[in-house]
A protein has these predicted regions:
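A compositional/biophysical signature of low hydrophobicity enriched in polar/charged and small residues
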Residues: 1-106
Length: 106
């Protein structure tokens, strides 16, 4: 199942909700959201800096991943960016492929 890194930032009412509910209840809500689309959360970490929360999760396909991100972003409580993750085997396979390419000016 494809793995993704979700970069989450709380905004406005989302920050107030986090302060009211705490992190554990937000984890339960996130687990439910992922599961409702056939996915699961591998790990979830709060942070401080440019990103409030990092979630590594498995999703069955890109459409489900986009549906999750759209729904979360539409809530207005947070913003979400997704990054597809690759395994070492994926990188090995990619490194064996050689596309035809000419650099600009060459």
């Amino acid at each position: 199942m494809p793995k993704y890194l979700f970069h989450v930032n709380y905004v406005g009412e989302g920050i107030k909700g986090l302060l009211k509910e705490g992190g554990t209840k937000r984890r339960a809500a996130a687990d439910q959201a992922f599961a409702s689309l056939g996915g699961s959360i591998e790990s979830m970490y709060y942070a401080f800096g440019d990103t409030d929360l990092f979630v590594i999760g498995d999703m069955p396909d890109q459409a489900s991943t986009v549906a999750l991100a759209l729904t979360l972003n539409a809530s207005g409580a947070l913003t979400v960016r997704t990054t597809p993750l690759m395994t070492m085997d994926d990188m090995d396979e990619a490194s064996k492929k050689s596309p035809a390419y000419r650099a600009p000016g060459q």
